[in-house]
């Protein structure tokens, strides 16, 4: 039996997508078109990218012009003329994706629109109408769970034509077999030079959307034996100033960490916090749970809404609510963080690159 042939159109080769395409390519013939040139991805450290194992055919499209910093690649059309068992367009807002969908509609070639996540917002009617027009260009959709399905349906997708998959950046081997014992956590904290008895971890860029200003205000009310460590590149002057104004001697900013070093910070922690103002998914939630950590995040984080069960493996708090975040952190730290971590591990086990590839293979190969 011949392999199924799949074509994907996406922005750039992020590490988890490279791993996913490699895994999917073990049982199918996968071609991936990238429309954003790597030199334009300035918000990512060069060490963040990974090379493919050769499991798929990657093609960098040629940028014809940039539309509001988005790439328009007219050469995408020539690749859409070839025969595939399934075509998947990731997202719907880039000029290249819109061009591809319009061409496929015109030629009556079936395809899927894939959306990693989405949050329904209050917005002007014209913006809602435009999004609806774009979403409904597709005849079928792929999403990451209930909340993404609700998002797509809000913009006109037919619920019965939305399929879901386990979204992840992790391979099966990346998920711990069991939670890290407290004795090992203490030894790691000592080795890392962490003086506080309890360590809270946050990871993300120092940008307003991540909500680290909210975390700093919440950390002010925590006990002094709790250290909050934020990993995400160089802290901006605004965050340095806020830390000083609040007198937060137990809040620490760490630069970019490679995978092995970051693993030690995860394992040394007892709680993970993502106080985001908005994340259409938030893969860092998957990663924290894979290290056996309870998670606190906001009601504007789709990964949290899908994966965190309030009071079981973490808490969901209202966005930008300092008091609620402080209360949730204090409650989690005073409780059984190991039990929360164990619940996170069990919840996250199906969310792997291998399962994600298996889901796609089954859905696209019908």
Please place each PLM-identified region on the residue numbering.
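Short alpha-helical donor nucleotide-sugar binding micro-motif in glycosyltransferases
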Residues: 256-257, 264-269
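Conserved acidic donor-binding segment of nucleotide-sugar-dependent glycosyltransferases
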Residues: 309-311, 315-322, 330-336
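A conserved mid-protein helix/loop that constitutes part of the nucleotide-sugar donor-binding site
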Residues: 19, 198-221, 238
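A short, histidine- and acid-enriched strand-loop-helix "catalytic/donor-clamping" loop
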Residues: 95, 109-127, 137-140, 144, ...
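Donor nucleotide-sugar binding/catalytic pocket of nucleotide-sugar-dependent glycosyltransferases
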Residues: 136-186, 194
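Aromatic "clamp/platform" in nucleotide-sugar-dependent glycosyltransferases that forms part
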Residues: 277
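Nucleotide-activated donor-binding/catalytic signature segment of Leloir-type glycosyltransferases, i.e.
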Residues: 239-257
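Short hydrophobic beta-strand element within catalytic cores of glycosyltransferases
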Residues: 294-298
């Amino acid at each position: 039996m011949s392999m199924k042939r799949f074509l994907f159109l996406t922005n750039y080769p992020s590490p988890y997508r490279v791993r996913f395409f490699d895994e999917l390519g073990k049982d199918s013939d996968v071609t991936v078109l990238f429309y954003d040139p790597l030199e334009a991805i300035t918000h990512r450290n060069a060490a963040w990218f990974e090379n493919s194992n050769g499991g798929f055919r990657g093609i960098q499209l040629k940028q014809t012009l940039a539309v509001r910093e988005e790439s328009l690649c007219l050469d995408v059309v020539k690749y859409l003329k070839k025969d595939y068992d399934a075509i998947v367009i990731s997202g719907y807002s880039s000029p290249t994706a819109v061009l591809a969908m319009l061409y496929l509609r015109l030629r009556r070639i079936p395809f899927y629109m894939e959306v990693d996540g989405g949050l329904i917002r209050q917005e002007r009617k014209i913006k809602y109408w435009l999004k609806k027009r774009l979403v409904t260009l597709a005849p079928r959709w792929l999403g990451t769970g209930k909340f993404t399905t609700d998002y797509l349906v809000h913009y006109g997708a037919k619920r019965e034509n939305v399929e879901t998959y386990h979204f992840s950046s992790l391979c099966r081997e990346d998920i711990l077999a069991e939670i890290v014992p407290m004795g090992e956590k203490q030894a790691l904290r000592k080795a890392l030079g962490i003086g506080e008895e309890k360590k809270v971890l946050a990871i993300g860029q120092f940008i307003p959307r991540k909500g680290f200003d909210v975390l700093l205000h919440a950390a002010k009310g925590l006990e002094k034996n709790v250290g909050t460590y934020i990993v995400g590149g160089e802290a901006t002057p605004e965050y340095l100033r806020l830390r000083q104004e609040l007198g937060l001697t137990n809040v620490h900013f760490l630069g970019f960490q490679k995978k092995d070093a970051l693993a030690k910070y995860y394992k040394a922690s007892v709680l993970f916090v993502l106080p985001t103002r908005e994340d259409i998914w938030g893969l860092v939630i998957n990663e924290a749970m894979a290290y056996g950590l309870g998670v606190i995040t906001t009601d504007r984080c789709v990964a949290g809404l899908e994966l965190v069960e309030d009071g079981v493996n973490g808490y969901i708090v209202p966005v930008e609510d300092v008091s609620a975040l402080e209360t949730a952190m204090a409650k989690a730290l005073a409780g059984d963080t190991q039990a929360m971590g164990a619940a996170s591990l069990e919840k996250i086990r199906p969310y792997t690159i291998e399962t994600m590839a298996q889901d796609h293979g089954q859905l696209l190969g019908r």
